[in-house]
């Protein structure tokens, strides 16, 4: 991980020979013990005041970084591999999926209250390719946690919302381009929706943050909803702006409940 740039892989995976260099049976509990220890410490400090959400990147997004080596505007090497060697792509995605299930399982055992699978680069694929190379593996992971609070977030995958709605999960995350009511009509009243404020809203004046957050809350009314951004908080955002957003939500709750 490079600060303010994101994941970096010095060795990419673009051939069968490179795939053989991966450890086939990594000890997830040992190698990522610092994550699980951090969860336990955080849970203790929180003392059940608020729920703690576990997190993992979805297989397609992890695949993009492993093939490309770093962030990209196009992820052309990753997308190219889907055409030139789909078998290799599926083999790598299967491995990522199995390790992700184990990683999230250990988070669950360490005490998280819910899990979220985050597919940041879902939107760079067309509908059919995302179904084959993305959602197939999202479904496998979600199925492994049936009965446990689980959120699926596929950024930019508007065309795939009908398929995402069919995957068993507690909640579906929305980016800021996804229509709330259309999504609600697809998933029904029992599924929780999460989102979907534009992350750039946090650069705005306080009054605008308050206005847009209240507008979002009004649009959900009494529906099942978790207020959130439509993606992550950008690195240079002033933390005070996040506090304004949170306070607005709390004030709204007091006013209408």
Language-model-detected regions and their locations in the chain:
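Active-site loop segments of alpha/beta catalytic cores
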Residues: 31-257
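Divalent-metal (Mg2+/Mn2+/Ca2+)-assisted nucleotide/phosphate chemistry catalytic cores
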Residues: 1
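A gly/proline- and charged-residue-enriched helix-loop-helix capping module
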Residues: 4-44
């Amino acid at each position: 991980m490079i600060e303010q740039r994101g994941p970096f892989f010095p060795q990419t995976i673009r051939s069968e020979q490179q795939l053989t260099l991966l450890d086939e049976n990594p000890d997830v509990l040992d190698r990522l013990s610092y994550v699980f220890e951090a969860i336990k410490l955080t849970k203790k400090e929180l003392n059940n005041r608020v729920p703690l959400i576990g997190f993992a990147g979805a297989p397609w997004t992890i695949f993009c970084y492993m093939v490309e080596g770093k962030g990209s505007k196009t992820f052309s090497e990753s997308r190219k591999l889907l055409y030139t060697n789909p078998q290799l792509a599926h083999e790598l995605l299967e491995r990522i999926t199995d390790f992700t299930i184990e990683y999230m399982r250990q988070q669950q055992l360490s005490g998280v209250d819910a899990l979220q699978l985050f597919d940041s680069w879902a939107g760079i694929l067309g509908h059919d390719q995302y179904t084959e190379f993305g959602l197939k593996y999202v479904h496998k992971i979600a199925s492994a946690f049936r009965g446990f609070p689980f959120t699926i977030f596929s950024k930019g995958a508007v065309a795939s919302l009908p398929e995402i709605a069919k995957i068993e999960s507690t909640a579906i995350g929305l980016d800021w381009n996804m229509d709330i009511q259309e999504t609600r009509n697809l998933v029904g009243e029992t599924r929780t929706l999460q989102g979907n404020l534009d992350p750039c809203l946090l650069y705005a004046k306080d009054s605008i943050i308050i206005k847009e957050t209240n507008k979002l809350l009004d649009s959900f009314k009494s529906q099942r909803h978790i207020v959130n951004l439509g993606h992550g908080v950008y690195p240079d955002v002033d933390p005070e702006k996040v506090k304004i957003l949170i306070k607005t939500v709390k004030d709204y709750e007091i006013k209408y409940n």
